[in-house]
From Swiss-Prot:
HAMAP family noted in UniProt: 23SrRNA_methyltr_RlmD
Gene Ontology BP terms: rRNA base methylation
Family label: Belongs to the class I-like SAM-binding methyltransferase superfamily. RNA M5U methyltransferase family. RlmD subfamily.
Transmembrane segments: none
Binding site for S-adenosyl-L-methionine: Q296, F325, N330, E346, N374, D395
Gene name for this UniProt entry: rlmD
Protein name: 23S rRNA (uracil(1939)-C(5))-methyltransferase RlmD
Biased composition (Basic residues): 1-15
Organism expressing this protein natively: Paraburkholderia xenovorans (strain LB400)
The protein's enzyme class: transferase
Length: 472
C-alpha cells in the first residue's frame, strides 16, 4: 500500500499566539449574581442598575448559578460582556473540586467544578428550555436521565499535536481555554486510563519522527480490544519513522493508521492482524469500524442508549422500521433482532457499506436493507416512495433532521401517504431537536410523549438527548 500523499503540499508551520495579559486583581472589580448557565456552561448574570431595571448581560466562565462573584471583562459589546471570574464571593452548594489538575487551563472540559448530578440537571434544563422557547412544547413525560461512568469514558478523541520550543517542546492533547495553544497536559481524566498514561510517551515518540513539526493531529479510537491512533501525515514518512511507529505499537499495544490526505486515504499501518470493534452484548452484536468512522465516544452510555431507544420504539415482530442517519448500523442491527424488517438510510457511502457488511457479519442481512441518500434534501415524495414503515428511528448530526420533519409534515397536511405511528429521535443538539419537534407536533400531528438527556459527554456542556413522538 502507498503511504505517500496523493499530492504534495507546502508544510504548514504553526505559529503560536502571544499569551493574553493576566488580569491584575485590584479589589475594585465589579460584582454580579449568577442566575443560570448558558449552552457553553458559562455563568449568566446581569449588571445591577440604580433604578432596578435589567442591566447588561454578563457571561462569566467558571462560575455556577447562585454564586456571587467578582469578574474581569475581556470582551465588551453594547448588549453583553464576556468575562472571567476573579473571585467567588459566595459559593454554590453544587460546586466541587475538579479532579483534573489541568482543568483551569485545558479546554477539553468545562464543567468539572459542578457536581455530576447537577451537571445532568443543568443539561435537562437546557433541553426543556429549548423545547419550550423554540417549539412551545413541554414533553408529557421527562425521561430518567441516561448517565454512567464520568471518568475514563472518552473512547474517541482528536488530539492536537504541536512542536512549541518556546513552551517546552512537544505537546499533545486538547487546546487551552480561549487559546490556540495546546494545554500542557501530562494526563487526562476523561480518556481511558491506558490512553492517559500514553500522553507523555506519545510526545517522545512524535519528537523522533521526521515530520514532528508538521503533524497536526492524532485521531484516537478505542475499541473493545484494540486502541487505534491515526497519524495525520501531510508528508510521506521515512523508513526510520515506520520503525519508530512499530516499536511504539509493540510496546504500548496500539495500532497505527496513516492518513496522508482526506478521510478516504486512511489505511492501517501496523499491526495488521487486529480489528477495531465495539459490542452491544444485549443484542449479540459486534460492530467493526474504522477509526475515522462515526461512532459514539462513550461505549457504556451507547449501550444504554440503544437499549432505551429500542424500548421506547417497541417494535413488534411484524413491524417495518426505518432508521434514518443509520451510520454503521448502531441502531439498525439491534432493531433487526426484534422486528420484521429494518431499512437503514445514511448519507455517507463509506458508512453505508460498513453497515451492510456489519449486517452480514451479525447474521441479520435477511432482515435489513441499506441505502445511501442525502437526508438533508429528502422530500415527501421520497418518503412515500419508500413505502409504509410502522416506526422511525432518527439519529441525525448536529444539523438535525429538518428535511425529514418537513416531509412528514407535508404528508400529514396532504393526507397522501403513510406516516409512522411512533418516532424515536436521538439528538446531539437541543436547538435542532426543538426545531424539528415543533414541525412534528404542530404540523405533522404528533405528540411529544417524552424527552430526556443522555450524558454522553460528562464534564462538558454537550447535551445529547432522546425524545419519543406518537401519532394517534
Amino acid at each position: 500500500m502507498s503511504r505517500t500523499a496523493p499530492h504534495r503540499r507546502a508544510p504548514k508551520r504553526y505559529k503560536t499566539p502571544p499569551p493574553a495579559p493576566a488580569h491584575v486583581v485590584t479589589g475594585n472589580e465589579p460584582v454580579i449574581e449568577i442566575i443560570s448557565l448558558d449552552m457553553e456552561a458559562r455563568g449568566v448574570g446581569r449588571t445591577e442598575t440604580e433604578d432596578g431595571t435589567p442591566g447588561k448581560v454578563i457571561f462569566v466562565e467558571g462560575v455556577l448559578p447562585g454564586e456571587r462573584v467578582s469578574y474581569s471583562t475581556h470582551r465588551s459589546k453594547p448588549k453583553f460582556e464576556q468575562a472571567e471570574v476573579v473571585q467567588v464571593l459566595r459559593e454554590s452548594v453544587m460546586r466541587t473540586k475538579p479532579k483534573c489538575t489541568y482543568f483551569d487551563i485545558c479546554g477539553g472540559c468545562s464543567m468539572q467544578h459542578l457536581d455530576i448530578r447537577a451537571q445532568v440537571a443543568v443539561k435537562q434544563r437546557v433541553l426543556e428550555d429549548n423545547l419550550q422557547h423554540l417549539a412551545k412544547l413541554r414533553p408529557e413525560t421527562v425521561f430518567r436521565p441516561i448517565h454512567g461512568p464520568s471518568w475514563g469514558y472518552r473512547y474517541r478523541a482528536r488530539l492536537a499535536v504541536r512542536f512549541l520550543p518556546e513552551k517546552g517542546g512537544m505537546r499533545i492533547g486538547f487546546h487551552e481555554k480561549k487559546s490556540s495553544y495546546i494545554a500542557d497536559m501530562k494526563t487526562c481524566e476523561v480518556l481511558p486510563p491506558h490512553v492517559s498514561a500514553m500522553l507523555m510517551p506519545l510526545r517522545f515518540m512524535v519528537r523522533k519522527l521526521s515530520i514532528y513539526d508538521r503533524m497536526p493531529q492524532l485521531e484516537l479510537a478505542v475499541g473493545s480490544s484494540v486502541t487505534a491512533l491515526v497519524v495525520r501525515n501531510l508528508e510521506p514518512i521515512t523508513a526510520a519513522d515506520e520503525q519508530v511507529l512499530r516499536d511504539f505499537a509493540d510496546e504500548h499495544k496500539v495500532q497505527f493508521w496513516l492518513q496522508p490526505g482526506g478521510p478516504d486515504t486512511v489505511t492501517p499501518f501496523y499491526p495488521l492482524d487486529v480489528q477495531l470493534d465495539y459490542t452491544l452484548p444485549e443484542y449479540g452484536i459486534r460492530m467493526p469500524f474504522k477509526p475515522t468512522d462515526f461512532t459514539q465516544v462513550n461505549h457504556a452510555i451507547n449501550r444504554v442508549l440503544v437499549s432505551r431507544a429500542l424500548r421506547l420504539l417497541a417494535p413488534a415482530r411484524t413491524d417495518r422500521v426505518l432508521d434514518l442517519f443509520c451510520g454503521i448500523g448502531n441502531f439498525t442491527l439491534p432493531l433487526a433482532r426484534i422486528s420484521k424488517e429494518v431499512m437503514g438510510i445514511e448519507g455517507s457511502e463509506v458508512l453505508t457499506s460498513r453497515a451492510l457488511a456489519n449486517a452480514g457479519l451479525n447474521g441479520v442481512a435477511g432482515h435489513t436493507s441499506f441505502e445511501c441518500r442525502n437526508l438533508f434534501e429528502v422530500t415527501a415524495d421520497d418518503l412515500r416512495a419508500l413505502g409504509h414503515f410502522d416506526k422511525f428511528l432518527i439519529d441525525p448530526p448536529r444539523e438535525g433532521a429538518l428535511a425529514v420533519a418537513k416531509a412528514l409534515a407535508e404528508i400529514a397536511r396532504s393526507g397522501n401517504g403513510p406516516l409512522p405511528k411512533r418516532i424515536v429521535y436521538v439528538s446531539c443538539a437541543p436547538a435542532t431537536l426543538a426545531r424539528d419537534a415543533g414541525l412534528l407536533v404542530h404540523e405533522a400531528g404528533y405528540r411529544l410523549v417524552g424527552a430526556g438527556v443522555v450524558n454522553m459527554f460528562p464534564h462538558t456542556s454537550h447535551v445529547e438527548s432522546i425524545a419519543l413522538f406518537e401519532r394517534d
